[in-house]
């Protein structure tokens, strides 16, 4: 079976947002390169370990997305471009790629990730740097959420500070299950994870078993009735806006909600939609992304 690479060249200010949108919409992997590499205009690499980059992408960037055979490159790119607010779909090329052991190639790039005050996300082939910390064992896979993306990190930091033992938590758009697993390890009970992708649901179940975290997972139609003390949703801004009424209704009066997958420039628009139901504001910003957090107003 052959895969396809979608290759897009575009300006720096759109490269990271486009790569994130492509991942959310189903790309197997996405990388950003210097489109001027091996030319006189080539710029130094960014993001070397231990360094804080002065910019998030090269001036002239090349985004390369690996797609499964069932994805139509033009359709996926158009959806991603629309999601990040581009006026038109960028020009692109498509290359055929023979199947390789992508999992092993990807694993070689992952190291333990420290998050917040006491969290470590550790691949199974590594030992935890601090065994006494709050350790989540998680291997990269097709489901979104390894702790490396700013939105996942923001939600994890918020959960670490917010979850109290015995509180009920709903993770809507659970991906790999990383947020649901963390909530359980912070003492939440019960914890429910919901995703539209059956593969993500299965991945999340396996990750929970590996972490000995009892979480109930399912597709949207399996979402239990009733309200939760905490609802967290790390998805894209458009789905968040469309599901505002439903997500807010899952929060108990006085309960809390956290939303991410939202670019800083999208924060006001998303907050305005949720303001009908909850008192909400930007909790924290990181690398151009925000986590919105709020409290559902008490019923009268």
UniProtKB/Swiss-Prot annotation:
Gene responsible for this protein: prmA
Organism the protein comes from: Burkholderia multivorans (strain ATCC 17616 / 249)
Protein name: Ribosomal protein L11 methyltransferase
Tagged with keyword Transmembrane: no
Role noted for this protein: Methylates ribosomal protein L11.
A GO term from the CC aspect: cytosol
Keywords noted in UniProt: Cytoplasm, Methyltransferase, S-adenosyl-L-methionine, Transferase
Residues that bind S-adenosyl-L-methionine: 152, 173, 195, 234
Family: Belongs to the methyltransferase superfamily. PrmA family.
Keyword Lipid metabolism attributed: no
CDD domains attached to this UniProt entry: AdoMet_MTases
Catalytic activity of the protein: L-lysyl-[protein] + 3 S-adenosyl-L-methionine = N(6),N(6),N(6)-trimethyl-L-lysyl-[protein] + 3 S-adenosyl-L-homocysteine + 3 H(+)
Biological process terms in GO annotation: methylation
InterPro entries attached to this UniProt entry: Ribosomal_L11_MeTrfase_PrmA, Ribosomal_PrmA_MeTrfase, SAM-dependent_MTases_sf
Domain of life of the organism encoding this protein: Bacteria
GO MF terms held by the record: protein-lysine N-methyltransferase activity
Cellular localisation: Cytoplasm
Organism ancestry: Bacteria, Pseudomonadati, Pseudomonadota, Betaproteobacteria, Burkholderiales
Cross-referenced Pfam families: PrmA
Enzyme class, broadest EC rank: transferase
EC number: 2.1.1.-
């Amino acid at each position: 079976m052959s895969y396809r690479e979608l290759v897009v060249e575009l300006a720096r200010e759109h490269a990271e947002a486009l790569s994130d949108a492509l991942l959310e919409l189903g790309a197997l992997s996405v990388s950003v390169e210097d489109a001027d590499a091996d030319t006189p205009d080539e710029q130094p690499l960014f993001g070397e370990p231990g360094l804080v980059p002065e910019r998030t992408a090269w001036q002239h960037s090349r985004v390369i997305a690996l797609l499964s055979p069932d994805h139509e490159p033009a359709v996926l790119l158009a959806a991603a471009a629309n999601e990040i607010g581009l006026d038109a779909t960028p020009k692109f090329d498509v290359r055929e790629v023979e199947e390789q052991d992508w999992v092993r190639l990807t694993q070689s790039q992952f190291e333990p990730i420290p998050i917040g005050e006491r969290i470590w996300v550790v691949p199974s082939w590594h030992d935890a740097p601090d065994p006494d910390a709050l350790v989540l064992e998680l291997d990269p896979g097709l489901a979104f959420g390894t702790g490396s993306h700013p939105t996942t990190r923001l939600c994890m930091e918020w959960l670490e500070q917010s979850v109290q033992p015995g509180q009920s938590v709903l993770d809507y758009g659970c991906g790999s299950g990383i947020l649901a697993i963390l909530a359980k390890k912070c003492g939440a009970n019960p914890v429910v994870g919901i995703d539209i992708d059956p593969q993500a649901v299965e991945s999340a179940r396996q990750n929970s078993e590996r972490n000995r975290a009892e979480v109930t997972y399912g597709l949207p139609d399996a979402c239990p009735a009733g309200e939760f003390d905490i609802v967290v949703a790390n998805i894209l801004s458009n789905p968040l806006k469309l599901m505002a009424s439903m997500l807010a209704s899952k929060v108990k009066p006085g309960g809390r909600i956290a939303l991410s997958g939202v670019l800083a420039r999208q924060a006001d628009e998303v907050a305005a939609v949720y303001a009908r139901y909850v008192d909400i504001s930007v909790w924290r910003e990181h690398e151009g992304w925000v986590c919105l957090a709020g409290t559902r107003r008490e019923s009268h």
